[in-house]
Amino acid sequence: MVVVVLAVVLTVWRHNGSTYLTGFWDNGSQTLVFGRMLQMQQNQTSPGGFMGVYTQDWSDEQNRYWYRDNTPVSPQDFQAYTHQTGLQGWAFGVLNKVLSVFEDRGEAREIILYNINSMLFYAATLLVCLAVWRAWGPLSALAWLCAVVFAPWPQRGMKDLYWCLWTWLLPALAGLLLCAVTRRRGKTPWWCYLLVFAACMVRCMCGFEFISTFLILCEASLVYCWAGGDRRAWLRRMICTGFAAVGGVAAALGAWFIQGVIYFGSAAGSWQNLTGAVTSRVSLTDDMVSDVSVAQVLTRYFVEVDEPLLQFGPLTITLKPLIAVTLLGFALCLAVLALRKKPLAVLAGPALVWVLSLAAPVSWMVLSKAHAYVCLLYTSDAADD
């Protein structure tokens, strides 16, 4: 209950439901959700249940305006977006239908959906903060919360109906819960692995972007426990968690494949669509893809991008100073431990988690160097995570 109340308070305080006060990003992708909600609002259907638009251009915001104005549309004009499952489109479509019972104005429903999406993101963040509190104390939890509340990119993006940022935290939360239950009981119940499976499946059904990031962050808390506990036992749990997470990804791919069979009418057509969507993200066949090396991608991520990751009024902090401050903090901790003649190994867990937090978004930048290199949104938002 406290988490829910705080999530509501933070959403209202930071005006996250307003595109005018907190901004937005990637409205082009959001049109797919608006198209799907408009379709369901008017009791229309199409094979496969994909998201889509009623215009020729995938990014045409006319779909959003038609949704807001409750404009009648023809089912023959619907273009399905078959490059992902589109679970978020169906979920928001159902929620929109419920809201329409007592709110006929599309613009009002849109604002409500933005607020709900933001509250879910804050709720997930607060649960992570609770885990951080238990591991490292209240100051660390407060720092984590501030890293979200005062981060420009998540503040703009948490309302986005396409990206659904709160689902990005589900695999990490599943990993944290697994660790908490295991440390309390001394063993890992089977349902903890099932939650990891479900978390990764749900996230991937809302989009496979940053898939490597989610898988790494899912394991981060287990790596922390491995560094400070029974390493053989925790290694075994890490392996089982990895299988559960990959199983969730495979299940999402299976759901996508079945949708494709329904839409295209054959397994061959669905397979061609699936493989084409995946390879276009990592090959030069996509118009957005740039022929860049891994070194160029890493240089862009760590050196070239100077978008603010934190903003406190006129004061902004970018990635390079943030890394420098963190390294300085580790150095001071090492010095204090050395002076007190305490084992330096106590910092192994936090250090590994920090390294994984940097490596997680970088892994996707390398795998999908095409979009990550040309699209500043991906780079900056991943850095905030």
Descriptions of predicted regions:
Residues 106-114, 144-170, 200-201, 205:
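Aromatic- and kink-enriched transmembrane "portal" helix at the membrane-lumen/periplasm boundary
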Residues 241-326:
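Membrane-lumen/periplasm interface segments of specific transmembrane helices
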Residues 143-144, 342-373:
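Transmembrane alpha-helix segments characteristic
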Residues 378-385:
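Conserved small/polar residues in nucleotide/adenosyl-binding loops
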Residues 124-129, 303, 307-348:
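Hydrophobic, aromatic-rich transmembrane alpha-helices
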Residues 70-111:
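Short hydrophobic/aromatic helix or loop-helix immediately within or flanking a transmembrane segment
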Residues 112-142:
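Transmembrane-helix motifs of polytopic, lipid-linked glycan transferases
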Residues 191-210, 214, 244-247:
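Membrane-interface alpha helices of multi-pass inner-membrane proteins
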